[in-house]
Amino acid sequence: MAQTENQKSKRIPLGKDVSTQRRLSKARRHFRLRKKIAGTTERPRLVVHRSSRHLHAQLVDDTVGKTIAAASSIEPDVRAVEGDKTAKGKKVGELIAARAKAAGVEAVVFDRGGHDYHGRIAALADAAREGGLKF
């Protein structure tokens, strides 16, 4: 069955839907950010990954390509936290700060992973600062 001209114009071109644009915009923001920052042994990169359900944080030394410490909302003690996802993000921030201190890390470079500094990302960063990490 042939499509009329009106039906063709209503189709959204491939790659132009909202979710694809949002994903590509996030990737562009993260790429721009990664051009400017890198983690060292003295000041590793605090990488944050956010999914719709969980939050992951890692301390990465980019000079040798190793993860120094990690924390995630998948861990049992974080899952046990009552409250919303922001409260769990705060707990992940506290955990990563404690693990960084145990590894001898005082200062970090914050890599928000292309996400807006808002909500869970901001809660994690604030909790890490309160835990003693310097950004």
Swiss-Prot record:
MF terms (GO), sorted A to Z: 5S rRNA binding; structural constituent of ribosome
Start and end residues of each stretch annotated as Disordered: 1-25
Listed SUPFAM superfamilies: Translational machinery components (SSF53137)
BP-aspect Gene Ontology terms: translation
Gene3D superfamilies for the chain: 3.30.420.100
Record note on quaternary structure: Part of the 50S ribosomal subunit; part of the 5S rRNA/L5/L18/L25 subcomplex. Contacts the 5S and 23S rRNAs.
Name this polypeptide is given: Large ribosomal subunit protein uL18
